[in-house]
């Protein structure tokens, strides 16, 4: 880009690139403007971005550095010779004679390119950025806390400035700032020197921050980076971001950087080369800012229906009713039935003779008793898994919110707890005292015919079978309900020994079986009454009979059919991160949809415990698979049992982060399969059962969000969609040689056979498969995890999506939260290596798959904004599985963008 404006002494102190000549072949020069250099390929995070669609574009940074030459330079005064870099004032620019030398020449940033691209390069967390001046007070306090004799040692520098979780990286920054300021830091620094360091780190001057980063890499301060120095910084960055695998391969990645930036094999690279690479890394993301700003500006225009508080309230209420109408009418019906039953029984006892003694207490007690019977019956309905799974496939699925069955179960449980306590209190604190203390003649006139001629005492009333069974019910239900609470069931409550056994899934599971006794006591309590009635007026058993029979039949059916639930293990993989993947034979007649789950039992661990896990295999696979995270006692023991029988994936001794694998043959492929299975824990399954994710086919656009192991229900969905896209796979869903573990879909069958070529055409997004099933047009999968090793769980699936999804139907976004977000100095060099490595061979250095990995956490508002603008007037199904902390923000964003745009987001979450 040419600029003929005369430069004065008051001009910016930045170097300005006049023109760049690019010589693609090395023997000719073609002039290219700066805008061309910076208009690089948009970086896709999805499947399209997973494979190199144009390697030459992705390698643009390296090719520019190799072939560019500089014609004209302007004075900047910021960057001088290596000798002047060490001081605070970086000195005058090099003379023209010194600038013109053979080989690659310095390319300085311009306001339009690198100034935008590098504006996010920072040494502090984003939470501190923008509040640096205010943060100095906290730093002063920490200095006073950690300083020894008025000087802060190097090992406390990171803690003092807010980089306490990356002390090693902070120490390198400390050394670089000391060299830059020519301060001897061996014995620590005082407060004034600390303030100088802090001011250097927070300067808005891009050159200053880049210079600090270069000085941190340039350990000997000679102005040149050797391969060993680059390797050292890569190791440092990998440690700061907890990337163990990247740390192992630091030498090869350093060699890759030198290969790209040092084509003449001089043995070093210079600051300007590093700067150009940094600019190329981040400038792509900047190219979309104008579009995003215009979208935000459009969103800022307030719709007419929002301009008054009343109209806004009406619109929001209407939207909420539209979104949750099924839940609203079911809960309303439930409340109405409870109110009607209460009022009916209340009015009935206003005419009872006992009303003259007890007053309204008796009426209220009988009213609560009636609705307690109803709710003790209803609470069993949401846990009739087989029945609900069947009903999901009927027209009732359009009327009843089966996805909220667990929430409705919890709602009724809360109602039962409140009603039971109220019913008990009315009897013990009102009815019994009045009956036992009223005048005898009063008692004889109104209660003698019903309760007997002898007036009972309070203790006598408390010792009646009705009272005893009622109190026992309260005790059993109280224990069961308490241990079912989230804090106990998830073992969040840390109780002292030996009470620690009262928390966890096992306690929840066994305590719930106390309710069998509670139901028996309920029937006795409702049959042996103080006031005698004929049997047909004792209605408690009538309420609970049908739900109890249905529940008992489901449990009994599972026990009777248990011999058919035995499966054989095809393969088991124990991953680092305490994750066990089980691949097992599929029982005959076991039909399921993607998104469903099943129960798994290991009798060798416990004969009675069944645990639910999402199915990760596709319906068309000949095998079943589940991925189990070892969190509790049972899952940890299961993982350990299989780990004992596993063999290392490689012959060499594996490191703690390597995979451990065990493989067996499936039934039919090995005549001695029963003998081989004797080595491994026995596994039984039952199911499948319906889950919210199975309704994904109702939507044309999917947004799948999984946190950690919460990705499991969506892996089955992605495999099913990929089955529809992959050539040579039958679309009827009968046989599918899918990926097992980390193996590719294109590999051999898990049974040792060749892949099956099925009929049916390869369909694009949103088409109907050969089997008549409708598939979504697009699927966006966001997988957020905090451990690099987690990507190994579904590496094969990610690679297959990158290879076979030619039309970008599936777009994957992997996020690693242990890494510092893009623009942070602690992850800057890793971003460079990621770009170069992916451009070279199409493999991501973080996930070691073909799908690019993003740093830190997603900006969910940005995700929803982009989808709403990309898919206007569409219905997007948002499916989430993971930590409950993200449920409320995602649900709020769905409601917000459904109101403010023409796109409608429908939120679903798993209920495990």
UniProtKB/Swiss-Prot annotation:
Q: Where is the EF-hand domain?
A: 205-240
Where, by residue number, does the polypeptide cross the bilayer?
A: 324-344, 364-384, 411-431, 459-479, 511-531, 698-718
One Pfam family matching this protein? NAD_binding_6
Q: According to the UniProt record, where is the region EF-hand-like 1?
A: 147-155
Q: Which GO terms describe its molecular function?
A: calcium ion binding; oxidoreductase activity, acting on NAD(P)H, oxygen as acceptor; peroxidase activity
Which residues are listed for Ca(2+) binding in this entry? Answer: 218, 220, 222, 224, 229
Q: Name one GO cellular component term.
A: membrane
What positions does the domain FAD-binding FR-type occupy?
A: 562-695
Where does the UniProt annotation locate this protein?
Membrane
Major site of localization recorded for this protein:
membrane
Q: Compositional bias (Polar residues) at which positions?
A: 29-44, 78-87
Residues assigned to the Extracellular compartment are: 345-363, 432-458, 532-697
Q: Where is the Ferric oxidoreductase domain?
A: 366-523
Q: What top-level class of enzyme does the UniProt entry assign? A: oxidoreductase
In this UniProt entry, the residues modified to Phosphoserine are: 294
Which segments carry the region annotation Disordered? 1-51, 73-112
Xref: CDD domains: NOX_Duox_like_FAD_NADP (cd06186)
Positions in the Cytoplasmic compartment: 1-323, 385-410, 480-510, 719-912
Source taxon at top rank: Eukaryota
Q: How does it assemble?
A: Monomer and homodimer.
Role noted for this protein = Calcium-dependent NADPH oxidase that generates superoxide.
* PANTHER family membership: NADPH OXIDASE, RESPIRATORY BURST OXIDASE HOMOLOG PROTEIN J-RELATED
The record's similarity note reads:
Belongs to the RBOH (TC 5.B.1.3) family.
Mind telling me what this protein is named?
A: Putative respiratory burst oxidase homolog protein J
Q: What is the lineage of its organism?
A: Eukaryota, Viridiplantae, Streptophyta, Embryophyta, Tracheophyta
